[in-house]
Amino acid sequence: MRPLVAGVTEAGITALPNLVQERLAKADCIIAATRFHADLPSHAKILNWPIPFSNIFNILEEHSKQSLVILATGDPMWFGAGATLVRQLGAEGCEVIPAVSGLQLAAARLGWPMANCRIASIHGRPLEQLRSVLSPRARVLVIAQDGASPKAVATALCDWGYGAADMHVLANLGGSQEARFSGTASHWQHDRMPDFHIIGIACDDAAPAIGPVAPDSRFENDGKLTKRDVRASALAKLAPFPQAVLWDIGTGSGAVSIDFLRAAPGGRAYGIDRNSVQLDRATANAGMHGVSGFEPVTGDLADSPNKVLDNLPVPDAVFVGGGVSVEVVTLAQARLRPGGVLVAHAVTIESESVLISAWQQTGGDLTRIAVQHADPVGGFHGWRPLMPVTQWTWLKGSGENDRCGA
């Protein structure tokens, strides 16, 4: 039998719609948070939420021939259990009936239009992920981990330059114990909150802005870094979009992957490098920027390309920032999905010759990027050039000679 995943609010079991009430009355097994157990039908087997939640699939298998109802907070398809179950079981594998979510209630209490709010979750996720949704004038709603979350968020906001942000904790939304606590991040006075709450953050006008391409100074690196001006061009060509998959070959500090993920919600970037120290650095940079979806992949494409790549999903985009060779370029072209884009950079004459040859043979767009910055020269200033970068962009299509921008 298909399990039912029903949303429930702090108003409790009695506030559930008639359809859900009827299903509860006939259920053989009900999974719900402990605070709802006393109001559930006594004839059914009552289970707590499984920890870890992945154990839910063992319960589903055990009760596959029985009527099973899962009560989840708010809208189960919005950062909830429903999304996980549908992803695993398929849309036909379970039935979902949503309730008003805590996020919606919080927005209503604060008078923030939902369409203008950014949503983040730190429930079972790193606190650093919050950083990716912060910017001047942003209105952010945060799904908390527990009662200690607001204090941790306030501390993090101060560390990140958002100490002037207004914070609102809306606890037990929709229930008889609903409460609201407010203050600035830099003067947050509340150490412990009720476990069920939503955090609202209102960033001030003077909050730091990063932009779509992060400054070089935000990346720990040993010099193997695609500089910001050049990275901006690469990102424009890679064209990130929600849930896009990037292969970042020769990932170095991970800067291209990180900026790609910042522009691709739900995306994944696979940083491929033979140097595990570089991958550790890239992973740390991803965490510092608050992006999820970065996966380090250790391996040498020159020695065992299939072993390195065979378990990775087909990429929508490939960036080659290091280790340019005929073999790597050919491999990237073959592995790209139809319609995908390949962007490769070269700074040496040898690697540039590889890109020129690839451009001559398979088309695309060949560009040379030369950047100069004003630097002191004695008591004056002059233009100090960076090494020019040759950039080759190639779109994979059905023809034998694909030309970008043709």
Regions found by a protein language model. Give the residues of each.
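S-adenosylmethionine
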Residues: 274, 295-376
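Class I SAM-dependent methyltransferase SAM-binding "motif I" and its flanking Rossmann-like core
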Residues: 3, 9-12, 74-137, 302-303, ...
